[in-house]
Amino acid sequence: NADIAHLFDPFNLKQGYIIALGVNDLKGKNNLNDLYEGNVGSAKTDICLEDYNKNANTFVGWYAKIIQRIQKMQPHTKFFLVTMPDEGTGNWKEESHAKALHEIADYLNNCYVIDLYHEAPKYDEEFRSKYFCGHMNAMGYLLTAHYFMTYIDWIIRHNVHDFRFVQFIGSDKIPFALG
Protein backbone atom coordinates (compact mmCIF):
# COMPACT_ATOMS: atom_id res chain seq x y z
CA ASN A 1 0.00 0.00 0.00
CA ALA A 2 1.41 3.39 -1.02
CA ASP A 3 0.16 5.12 2.15
CA ILE A 4 1.98 2.63 4.37
CA ALA A 5 5.17 2.90 2.29
CA HIS A 6 4.99 6.70 2.60
CA LEU A 7 4.78 6.39 6.40
CA PHE A 8 8.15 4.64 6.48
CA ASP A 9 9.81 6.74 3.76
CA PRO A 10 13.09 8.05 5.25
CA PHE A 11 12.52 11.36 3.42
CA ASN A 12 9.08 11.77 5.02
CA LEU A 13 9.91 11.33 8.70
CA LYS A 14 8.29 13.68 11.21
CA GLN A 15 9.22 15.13 14.58
CA GLY A 16 6.10 13.64 16.11
CA TYR A 17 3.24 11.30 15.33
CA ILE A 18 -0.28 11.00 16.68
CA ILE A 19 -1.29 7.35 16.38
CA ALA A 20 -4.96 6.44 16.79
CA LEU A 21 -5.32 2.78 15.84
CA GLY A 22 -7.60 0.04 17.08
CA VAL A 23 -11.13 1.37 16.64
CA ASN A 24 -11.78 -0.53 13.42
CA ASP A 25 -10.17 -3.62 14.96
CA LEU A 26 -12.80 -3.53 17.68
CA LYS A 27 -15.92 -3.06 15.54
CA GLY A 28 -18.32 -5.85 16.28
CA LYS A 29 -16.05 -7.38 18.92
CA ASN A 30 -16.45 -7.55 22.68
CA ASN A 31 -12.82 -6.71 23.33
CA LEU A 32 -9.38 -6.78 21.78
CA ASN A 33 -8.84 -10.36 22.95
CA ASP A 34 -11.42 -11.63 20.43
CA LEU A 35 -9.24 -10.46 17.56
CA TYR A 36 -5.92 -11.79 18.68
CA GLU A 37 -6.80 -15.35 19.66
CA GLY A 38 -7.43 -14.36 23.25
CA ASN A 39 -4.25 -12.32 23.55
CA VAL A 40 -4.07 -8.54 23.30
CA GLY A 41 -0.49 -8.94 24.34
CA SER A 42 1.83 -7.47 26.88
CA ALA A 43 4.63 -4.99 26.32
CA LYS A 44 7.06 -7.01 28.43
CA THR A 45 6.50 -10.27 26.55
CA ASP A 46 5.50 -9.12 23.06
CA ILE A 47 7.89 -6.30 22.24
CA CYS A 48 11.44 -7.19 21.23
CA LEU A 49 13.53 -4.07 21.81
CA GLU A 50 16.43 -5.41 19.74
CA ASP A 51 14.43 -6.35 16.61
CA TYR A 52 10.85 -5.23 16.00
CA ASN A 53 10.47 -8.01 13.42
CA LYS A 54 10.49 -10.41 16.37
CA ASN A 55 7.53 -8.74 18.09
CA ALA A 56 4.69 -11.12 18.89
CA ASN A 57 1.66 -11.44 16.63
CA THR A 58 -0.58 -9.48 19.00
CA PHE A 59 -2.15 -6.03 19.07
CA VAL A 60 0.65 -4.78 21.34
CA GLY A 61 3.33 -6.38 19.15
CA TRP A 62 1.97 -4.91 15.93
CA TYR A 63 1.34 -1.45 17.39
CA ALA A 64 4.84 -1.30 18.85
CA LYS A 65 6.33 -2.47 15.55
CA ILE A 66 5.04 0.67 13.82
CA ILE A 67 6.65 2.87 16.47
CA GLN A 68 9.92 0.92 16.56
CA ARG A 69 10.28 0.95 12.79
CA ILE A 70 10.02 4.74 12.75
CA GLN A 71 12.28 5.06 15.81
CA LYS A 72 14.96 3.06 14.03
CA MET A 73 15.09 5.77 11.34
CA GLN A 74 14.32 8.77 13.59
CA PRO A 75 15.24 7.81 17.19
CA HIS A 76 14.10 10.99 18.95
CA THR A 77 10.66 11.28 17.34
CA LYS A 78 7.81 11.72 19.82
CA PHE A 79 4.72 9.51 19.65
CA PHE A 80 1.29 10.33 21.03
CA LEU A 81 -0.83 7.18 21.35
CA VAL A 82 -4.57 7.85 21.40
CA THR A 83 -6.90 5.68 23.43
CA MET A 84 -10.47 5.09 22.38
CA PRO A 85 -12.97 7.22 24.28
CA ASP A 86 -15.30 5.65 26.82
CA GLU A 87 -18.64 5.23 25.03
CA GLY A 88 -20.45 4.86 28.34
CA THR A 89 -21.80 1.42 27.44
CA GLY A 90 -20.00 -0.51 30.15
CA ASN A 91 -18.21 -2.55 27.47
CA TRP A 92 -14.63 -3.05 28.56
CA LYS A 93 -13.09 -3.09 25.06
CA GLU A 94 -12.17 0.59 25.33
CA GLU A 95 -10.52 -0.01 28.70
CA SER A 96 -8.54 -2.97 27.29
CA HIS A 97 -7.33 -0.73 24.47
CA ALA A 98 -6.34 2.06 26.88
CA LYS A 99 -4.45 -0.35 29.12
CA ALA A 100 -2.53 -1.77 26.14
CA LEU A 101 -1.49 1.72 24.96
CA HIS A 102 -0.32 2.73 28.44
CA GLU A 103 1.81 -0.43 28.57
CA ILE A 104 3.39 0.38 25.21
CA ALA A 105 4.10 3.99 26.25
CA ASP A 106 5.67 2.81 29.50
CA TYR A 107 7.87 0.31 27.67
CA LEU A 108 9.08 2.31 24.65
CA ASN A 109 10.97 5.61 24.67
CA ASN A 110 9.40 8.89 23.58
CA CYS A 111 5.81 7.61 23.78
CA TYR A 112 2.99 9.43 25.54
CA VAL A 113 -0.70 8.63 25.85
CA ILE A 114 -3.57 10.91 24.90
CA ASP A 115 -6.04 9.17 27.18
CA LEU A 116 -9.51 9.88 25.86
CA TYR A 117 -10.84 6.89 27.78
CA HIS A 118 -10.10 8.37 31.21
CA GLU A 119 -9.79 12.11 30.53
CA ALA A 120 -12.37 13.03 27.86
CA PRO A 121 -16.14 13.17 28.34
CA LYS A 122 -17.98 9.92 27.72
CA TYR A 123 -19.00 9.54 24.09
CA ASP A 124 -22.42 8.42 25.28
CA GLU A 125 -25.82 8.78 23.60
CA GLU A 126 -26.16 12.48 24.48
CA PHE A 127 -22.63 13.26 23.22
CA ARG A 128 -23.24 11.26 20.03
CA SER A 129 -26.51 13.09 19.33
CA LYS A 130 -24.57 16.37 19.17
CA TYR A 131 -21.25 15.36 17.65
CA PHE A 132 -21.99 12.33 15.45
CA CYS A 133 -23.98 11.53 12.34
CA GLY A 134 -22.77 7.98 11.72
CA HIS A 135 -19.17 9.14 12.05
CA MET A 136 -18.22 12.31 13.86
CA ASN A 137 -19.62 15.47 12.32
CA ALA A 138 -17.59 18.67 11.84
CA MET A 139 -18.26 19.80 15.41
CA GLY A 140 -17.15 16.41 16.74
CA TYR A 141 -13.88 16.51 14.81
CA LEU A 142 -13.23 20.09 15.92
CA LEU A 143 -13.88 19.20 19.55
CA THR A 144 -11.62 16.14 19.29
CA ALA A 145 -8.87 18.26 17.71
CA HIS A 146 -9.10 20.60 20.70
CA TYR A 147 -8.81 17.60 23.06
CA PHE A 148 -5.67 16.52 21.22
CA MET A 149 -4.11 20.01 21.24
CA THR A 150 -4.89 20.56 24.92
CA TYR A 151 -3.65 17.12 25.93
CA ILE A 152 -0.41 17.39 23.92
CA ASP A 153 0.19 20.82 25.45
CA TRP A 154 -0.32 19.30 28.91
CA ILE A 155 2.05 16.40 28.12
CA ILE A 156 4.76 18.79 26.90
CA ARG A 157 4.41 21.11 29.91
CA HIS A 158 4.68 18.12 32.27
CA ASN A 159 7.66 16.62 30.39
CA VAL A 160 9.59 19.75 29.41
CA HIS A 161 12.94 17.98 29.60
CA ASP A 162 11.80 15.44 26.97
CA PHE A 163 10.69 18.12 24.51
CA ARG A 164 13.35 20.81 24.85
CA PHE A 165 15.16 19.85 21.63
CA VAL A 166 12.28 18.75 19.37
CA GLN A 167 13.15 21.47 16.87
CA PHE A 168 16.34 19.52 16.09
CA ILE A 169 14.67 16.15 15.47
CA GLY A 170 15.45 15.10 11.92
CA SER A 171 18.24 17.61 11.43
CA ASP A 172 21.96 17.09 11.51
CA LYS A 173 22.13 19.69 14.28
CA ILE A 174 21.38 17.37 17.18
CA PRO A 175 22.46 18.88 20.51
CA PHE A 176 24.94 16.84 22.52
CA ALA A 177 22.21 15.99 25.05
CA LEU A 178 20.34 13.97 22.42
CA GLY A 179 23.46 12.46 20.85
Region roles according to the model:
Residues 1-53, 57, 61:
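Conserved SGNH/GDSL esterase-like catalytic core that processes O-acyl groups on lipids
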Residues 2-13, 70-73, 154, 158, ...:
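Surface-exposed acidic, glycine-flexible loop patches that form ligand/cofactor-binding
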Residues 3, 59-66, 97-101, 144:
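A general structural detector for well-ordered alpha-helical segments in enzyme core domains, enriched
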Residues 23-24, 64-98:
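Active-site segments of SGNH/GDSL-like serine hydrolases
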Residues 57-61, 69-78, 106-112:
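Structural alpha-beta junctions
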